[in-house]
A protein has these predicted regions:
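Interfacial helix-loop-helix junctions of multi-pass membrane proteins
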Residues: 115-143
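"…centered on the first transmembrane helix and the immediately adjacent amphipathic helix/loop
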Residues: 2-87
Length: 168
């Protein structure tokens, strides 16, 4: 690999890593905010979605259901994005298959620790509490992110193999 290509890969890895650190910081910051702030933020988002999706005012049951759905999906989606991004970094850093496998295992351990840790430390924040269900949602998000990355990589590999066989 030429020096220019190595430098390009280094820049991509650096950019991806910086984006992931900003994402992790935001995730932890949102996760560890006080209960009242978290409730206000979620309520504001629920009201905006309710106004945009429905023409009439939402009743208490609809607001509660939408609030629960948003909080559940937030756990799941945020950790899916985190896992997908960290898998991308692992595949850029490790070139050989054994190294990539190590990178994926390391990714799973780091993401699972973040998934459980963000929930665990909520019990030390005013107005927040630990819920094992939320920790499991986070971990399911990590698994879905990993699976999504592997499927995307498999599709990319198949397209690349097909295009190289057609060019011969």
């Amino acid at each position: 690999m030429s020096n220019a290509k190595k430098f390009g890969v280094f820049l991509v890895v650096l950019l991806c890593a910086a984006c992931m650190f900003v994402f992790i910081y935001t995730l932890v910051k949102l996760s560890l905010q006080e209960g009242e702030s978290s409730s206000r933020l979620t309520q504001a988002v629920v009201n905006q979605i309710g106004e945009a999706a429905f023409d009439e005012e939402l009743d208490a049951n609809q607001i509660h259901a939408l609030n629960l759905f948003l909080r559940t999906m937030a756990h799941f989606v945020l950790f899916s994005i985190l896992s997908f991004g960290m898998c991308t970094i692992a595949f850029l850093v490790f070139a050989h298959p054994a190294g990539r496998f190590f990178g994926l295992v390391l990714n799973m351990l780091i993401c699972a620790a973040l998934a459980y840790g963000t929930e665990y430390f909520k019990q030390f924040v005013d107005g927040r509490h630990f819920q094992i269900e939320d920790a499991w949602l986070n971990i399911y998000g990590v698994i879905i992110g990993l699976c999504s990355f592997l499927i995307a990589d498999l599709i990319f590999w198949a397209i690349r193999a097909r295009s190289s066989s057609q060019s011969e």
